[in-house]
Amino acid sequence: MKRFELIAPCHFGLEAVLKHEITELGYDVIQVEDGRVTFAGDAEAVCCANIYLRSAERILIKIGSFQAQTYEELFQGTKSLPWEEFIPTDGRFWVTKAASVKSRLFSPSDIQSVMKKAMVERMKEVHHIEWFSEEGASFPIRVFLMKDEVTAALDTTGVSLHKRGYRKLTAKAPIAENLAAALIMLTPWNSGRILVDPFCGSGTFPIEAAMMAANIAPGVNRSFTAQQWPHLIEPRQWEEIRQEAAEQADAGVETDIQAYDIDENVVALARANARMAGVEHLIHFQQRSVKDLSHSKKYGFIITNPPYGERMEEKKSLPGLYGMIGERFKALDSWSMYLITSYERAEEAMGLKAAKNRKIYNGMMKTYFYQFPGPKPPKKK
């Protein structure tokens, strides 16, 4: 069976979470770099990674890499790669994205244009064909340039993996599903411990936690670009892995996940999203202000993405809001709290000092993941 070098991009700062996920699936990690993890795998690995990985953004098949400081070197390097091993003569292929960091070549549109021409020339020479219809399956290509090293890869995913298919409606500034899942995995939370999100918004944190508790694979109900590539991945492989994933889900799991928001319309929206994800029955939704946050249970978790003041008038209310968060958390003396925000003065406003403060880039926005771990519950005798 053909082996691939697979690349899984992720949010900057969360590479260790993705590496652990890949290792848990049974695949060998080759390299961990800023914002991506490279691992070895076959066609089945492409299916498994797309369907099971919670923190990845997409799964790429590496075609090759080379050095290029000029567009001529880019053309020749691209032409030297074995495109014909992956793309059939009727395939529709193009460079969907080019990213350049610390490299001589930096114009995405020029990089895309030159590489497309080189790929066509390669295919012409190999297949002895002058014209390609490009009416078949899509083969989107992603290119990274880092310090003049060009890496070209086929995108097996298509629409980003954070699109699970359940979030048809969104509240303001929703957190990406794969980012929420990765942050939950950074905490010690498990399905036997209560989880509360007092700013649930679209419901992403509670829904992702419920999917983990029920062992629902994040990609089980969506499609992928590589499903149209039977010459590389047999259709039965997709079907078998989807079936395995569906059989492993446990919709009857007992867990205590609670989602609150001050806006009743937002709560209704979050509930609708949970219904789409098949986990509505696992989450208690309630219209509730953070100032009313209290709980009789011990050793619970607050995992949340509070408002961080996108507009100037909102920023003025942040000290008071975060002060209230700190006050309510202090009253929950055995609890743990994990929150992500771009508000730089969050600790000061809450009157708390985080045990850890991890910087995470959410797109181009620098955010902070504040971690306030509480005591561990006593072991059951």
Model-derived features: where do they sit?
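Flexible, glycine-/basic-rich loop-and-beta segments that form/coincide
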Residues: 48-55, 159-164, 168, 374-381
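SAM-dependent Rossmann-like transferase core, predominantly class I methyltransferases
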Residues: 152-186
